[in-house]
A protein has these predicted regions:
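Active-site-proximal alpha-helix that buttresses catalytic centers in soluble enzyme cores
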Residues: 1-259
Length: 259
């Protein structure tokens, strides 16, 4: 008798409706198109986001709740795909939860985060180089979340992949990790950049993008760059909106199916 299978995505989540629909939803839809025969479910890890959405009438389960629901539905083989970009504390918590549930499934498979290996870092660099064309006097600054976790190393790894490909005009920074504006401003000066395209290196263009990256506050990336005399053009576009990034998540799913 064939095992009952299903696909579960797990995201941090966002309360921004457009980002939830176009960016998280864009990734989810690409995955569903790849395996239309599998029942699909989603989970959000942020209690705050789940509470806000519940107040609006949209219930999204936690990972633990979603796993219990899959067990109740009789699922034996579950493919779990996180939309997280890097192997940080959030991903570690997901992995720990999965391990605690593993004995209760016949086959429970967890995909790595998007930038969980060198091949995917290089693939994402290729997508970014295609998205952001080189223009004289212009630099592109992409800002990720950042973390104190060793997984923060994926940001300089991505920068290395871009630089080795000859695209040193695309710079990678973080909100809460390294490098920050103080590290990137001297690089922009050496490059002679006059204009900066400022965009999030995040799945969704939510609160971090609108406040910490492109917000009006004095400590935002936009304000710090403008204070240095640069002309800044924010582009509030989450990575999940890009079809090429959606395809990278599909590649992660295909790896999971082949295990």
């Amino acid at each position: 008798m064939e095992k009952k299978r299903a696909l579960l995505t797990v995201s941090f989540g966002t309360a921004a409706e457009e980002a939830r629909r176009e960016e998280i939803g864009g990734v989810e839809e690409a995955l569903r198109r790849r395996v239309p025969e599998l029942p699909f479910a989603r989970a959000y890890t942020s209690p705050t986001i789940r509470r806000i959405l519940a107040q609006r009438g949209t219930a999204v389960p936690s990972l633990e709740e979603a796993l219990e629901e899959q067990l109740s539905a009789g699922v034996e083989q579950l493919y779990l795909l996180p939309t997280h970009l890097l192997p940080g504390y959030e991903y570690d918590a997901i992995a720990a939860t999965v391990e605690s549930f593993r004995p209760r499934f016949r086959d429970l498979r967890l995909a790595p985060p998007l930038m969980g290996d060198t091949d995917m870092v290089r693939a994402l660099a290729g997508v970014l180089m295609e998205r952001w064309r080189r223009l004289l006097g212009q630099a592109v600054v992409l800002v990720g979340h950042g973390t104190a976790h060793p997984g923060n190393l994926v940001y300089p790894a991505l920068q290395g992949a871009l630089s080795l490909a000859g695209r040193g005009d695309i710079l990678v920074g973080t909100v809460e990790g390294w490098p920050g504006p103080e590290e990137l401003l001297p690089v922009l000066e050496r490059q002679g950049a006059e204009r900066v395209i400022l965009a999030p290196l995040l799945l969704t263009a939510g609160t971090h993008a609108r406040e910490d990256i492109a917000g009006p506050g004095p400590e935002s990336w936009k304000s710090r760059l403008e204070a240095a005399g640069l002309t800044v053009h924010p582009v509030l576009e989450g990575l999940g909106r890009l079809p090429q990034v959606q395809e990278l998540y599909v590649r992660r799913l295909e790896q999971l199916l082949e295990e």
